[in-house]
Swiss-Prot record:
Pfam families assigned: TerD
Organism per entry: Alcaligenes sp
Gene: terA
Coiled-coil parts of chain: none
Single GO biological process annotation from the record: response to tellurium ion
Function: Not yet known.
Keywords: Plasmid, Tellurium resistance
Stated name of the protein: Tellurium resistance protein TerA
Length: 339
């Protein structure tokens, strides 16, 4: 761990410095040990403060004096006391960067435990009052849905809060590495996020940028697209929000991604969908085993099971929304649309 109290790691490949409100981490990727697969950049707030009390928060990647990429965190209404701003990670021999901007309401302790670091609790008072039984400890490790573990259930709650679903991918074929693999191609793939939504009363709708069917968060169908990344330049990809306060009104949500523009090449997109539910570990499903003759992937399904959320991995590929509709029996009527 490298921070203001320990400004260098043991081999000097990562160092920290700060001036005013600016903090700088210098990372020498060539000196990192071979077993280092990921470097995470985080921020925590002191006391009872949350990140929404900050005036500005962003992360910028530089090489020399050249700014390569940057991402700004939307702070309004955020309740987290600790955030993962982004990660530099090793994949297929290259170093890549992903902007995350997700975190934990509990601050440093759950953040540290997420990365496997134990943080001691505050010392108890000398004469503490009797405490109620502690709730079962929730594991904050990321959950990956796979063939071997295709589903997970989240315990029933009256209010799940704002459920956020993120689609992120590599836009172009480039030359590999941190720049080439992520940002260096003019032949970017426009990968779009979408959802089929069925409410408890049987009402069904499609939420996607295609056809400007962006949905609605506060009223039916309680699912809404957060814009459309047509340029491929947004570091955090595309987002779909589900109103967890109204989960009782939702029967199921089918999450999918489709290639609106570009030649299908699922293995090169390295696509991943991540589900973020407040106070729950992130749940991710990767777009693997892609069929390059098909432009749409049915990724996962969220099912209301007596008030709980069951997340099921699907990972099936189709030629389009209409073919997927027939496969799962939704019964929509389709016509050609555009963005």
């Amino acid at each position: 761990m490298v921070f203001y109290g320990q400004p260098r790691n043991e081999d000097g490949s990562i160092s920290f410095s700060a001036e005013g409100t600016n903090s700088v981490f210098t990372v020498d990727l060539s000196r990192l040990k071979p077993d280092v697969q990921k470097v995470a950049f985080t921020v925590t707030c002191d006391g009872s403060h949350t990140v929404s009390s900050l005036n500005h928060l962003s992360i910028q990647i530089e090489s020399g004096n050249t700014s390569l990429i940057s991402g700004q965190v939307e702070l309004s209404g955020r309740q987290e006391a600790a955030l993962i701003l982004g990660e530099v990670y090793r994949r297929n021999g290259d170093w890549k960067f992903v902007f995350i901007a997700q975190g934990f309401n509990g601050g440093l302790k759950p953040l540290a435990e997420y990365y496997g670091v134990n943080v001691a609790d505050e010392p108890a008072p000398v004469t503490p009052p009797p405490a109620p039984p502690a709730p079962p400890k929730v594991s904050l490790s990321k959950v990956s849905l796979t063939k071997e573990k295709p589903a997970i259930s989240l315990a029933k709650k009256a209010n799940f809060g704002e459920i956020r679903i993120n689609l992120n991918w590599h836009r172009g074929s480039g030359s590999g590495g941190l720049l080439g693999g992520m940002f260096g191609s003019n032949k970017a793939i426009d990968l779009d996020l979408g959802a089929f939504v069925e409410l408890a009363d049987g009402y069904k709708s499609v939420v996607q940028a295609l056809g400007n069917a962006f949905g609605n968060y506060h009223s039916e169908p309680y699912v809404q697209m957060q814009g459309d990344d047509r340029t491929g330049e947004a570091l955090d990809g595309e987002w779909l929000h589900i109103n967890g306060r109204e989960w009782k009104e939702i029967r199921q949500v089918l999450i999918y991604a489709f290639i609106y523009q570009g030649v299908p090449s699922w293995d090169k997109t390295d696509g991943v969908v991540t589900l973020h539910v407040p106070e729950q570990p992130p749940i991710e499903s990767r777009l693997t085993e892609g069929d390059n003759k098909r432009t749409l992937c049915a990724i996962a399904r969220l099912v209301n099971e007596n008030g709980s959320i069951r997340v099921e991995r699907i990972n099936q590929y189709f030629r389009g929304q209409e073919e997927m509709d027939r496969a799962f029996g939704w019964g929509f009527r389709w016509s050609r649309g555009s963005k």
